[in-house]
């Protein structure tokens, strides 16, 4: 067994190395500033970031927000000196904290006549086909050429979906980031108000064994969240195109680059929103929406995992209203720690955010970040429930006034 494993790994490495066009970034010793908790910053190398990911240690890479020189000058971190791998802890800087407004979210669903007809049009064959395409890229690692190719495929798919809308009803944006080629994608369905309702998912994948070399299909993490929100986008766009629905608040669907690098894409997006004084009344992250074997094996009913730590209580309560009204499974509250997905980037910039995952955290897929994160392991009936939730959230909150 050991020999077989060694040979298999060697073959995989040879195959990966033969992909000359992959063009992986190998800036292993570049210094980065990461935030590992509300009051902790560290100066680390890229190699240390990967090690932290392997250990399950969560963080936000804030290097694009605060330069290393400024961080040292402000006392956020100590100078790295001659070491590229030494980590440093520092106190929270008050200027980095941004208060989160309290909104008066609806306490009852009120748009059933719009939402219910759309839920009957969910096309799981389309969802499965999209995920098959998306997870077929060798990797969607944000520093790889195939990570850029997968972003191009996703952009083209989104562009086709919104092509039925008039030009003044939609804005489609590629958000380019400094330091890597994979871009984030923002679809903005223009409302009467510039206040934003955001649905998010991350498009990248990673193989933590050898990120620069090995295949990372990322079917569940986060291909499932991506196709969940793609189908919700298709249904919402169809409702707008047919006159069934016109958003009051501007409704946005975000597909973030480089979540696996420390929420790099989303922290860039929401930092720009903050700098431009944009208002976001709610952000819902869908990251891993398709795995139920962990719950079923333990004799637990399939359910949503509603993250209760480092999320917005008021928005979570609104999500509970949506689950009760439009979904066939319950939610279980669960915790995932600081900065466990892109909703943390919204919170860091003073925007209310929630995160819904496939189950309680202890039952979620364990094969993520490996070659084993494949489509055949997923439950599309469960993804169906996440789509229903996303459509309900998007329409109810985008039609809510006087928040």
Located regions from the model:
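Fungal secretory targeting signals
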Residues: 1-18
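Primarily auto-inhibitory N-terminal propeptides
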Residues: 17-102
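N-terminal hydrophobic or amphipathic helices/low-complexity stretches enriched
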Residues: 86-144
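Second-shell loop/turn segments in exported
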Residues: 113-122, 135-146, 173-175, 211-222, ...
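A non-catalytic alpha/beta surface segment that caps or lines the substrate-entry region
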Residues: 126-190
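Structural recognition of the beta-strand scaffold that forms the well-ordered cores
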Residues: 127-135, 171-174, 184-188, 196-201, ...
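Acidic/histidine-rich catalytic neighborhood of metal-dependent amide-processing enzymes
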Residues: 181-183, 213-314, 318
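Active-site-adjacent substrate-binding region
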Residues: 291-403
């Amino acid at each position: 067994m050991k020999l077989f494993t060694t040979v298999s790994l060697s073959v995989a490495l040879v195959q990966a190395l033969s992909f000359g066009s992959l063009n992986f970034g190998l800036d292993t010793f570049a210094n980065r500033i990461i935030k590992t908790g509300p009051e902790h910053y560290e100066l680390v190398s890229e190699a240390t970031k990967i090690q932290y990911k392997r250990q399950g240690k969560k963080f936000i890479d804030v290097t694009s927000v605060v330069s290393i020189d400024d961080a040292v000058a402000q006392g956020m971190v100590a100078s790295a000196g001659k070491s590229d791998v030494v980590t440093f802890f520092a106190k929270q800087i008050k200027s980095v904290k941004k208060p989160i407004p309290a909104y008066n979210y609806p306490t009852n669903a009120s748009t059933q006549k719009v939402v219910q007809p759309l839920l009957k049009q969910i096309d799981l064959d389309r969802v499965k086909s999209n995920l098959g395409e998306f997870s077929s890229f060798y990797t969607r690692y944000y520093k790889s050429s195939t990570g850029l190719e997968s972003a191009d495929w996703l952009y083209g798919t989104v562009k086709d979906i919104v092509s039925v809308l008039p030009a003044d009803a939609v804005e489609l944006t590629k958000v380019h980031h400094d330091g890597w080629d994979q871009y984030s994608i923002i679809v903005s369905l223009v409302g009467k108000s510039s206040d934003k309702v955001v649905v998010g998912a991350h498009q990248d994948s990673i193989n933590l064994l050898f990120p620069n070399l090995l295949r990372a299909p990322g079917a569940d993490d986060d291909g499932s969240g991506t196709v969940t929100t793609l189908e919700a986008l298709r249904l919402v766009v169809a409702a707008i195109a047919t006159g069934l629905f016109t958003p009051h608040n501007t409704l946005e669907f975000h597909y973030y680059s480089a979540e696996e690098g420390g929420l790099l894409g989303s922290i860039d997006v929401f930092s720009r929103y903050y700098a431009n004084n944009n208002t976001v009344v709610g952000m819902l992250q869908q990251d891993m929406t398709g795995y139920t074997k962990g719950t079923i094996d333990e004799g637990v009913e399939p359910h949503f995992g509603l993250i209760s730590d480092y999320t917005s209580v008021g928005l979570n309560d609104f999500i509970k209203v949506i689950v009760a009204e439009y979904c066939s499974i319950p939610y279980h509250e669960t915790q995932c720690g600081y900065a466990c997905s892109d909703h943390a980037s919204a919170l860091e910039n003073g925007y209310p955010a929630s995160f819904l995952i496939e189950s309680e955290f202890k039952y979620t897929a364990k094969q993520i970040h490996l070659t084993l994160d494949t489509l055949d392991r997923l439950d599309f009936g469960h993804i169906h429930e996440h789509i229903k939730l996303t459509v309900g959230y998007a329409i109810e909150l985008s039609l809510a006034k006087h928040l």
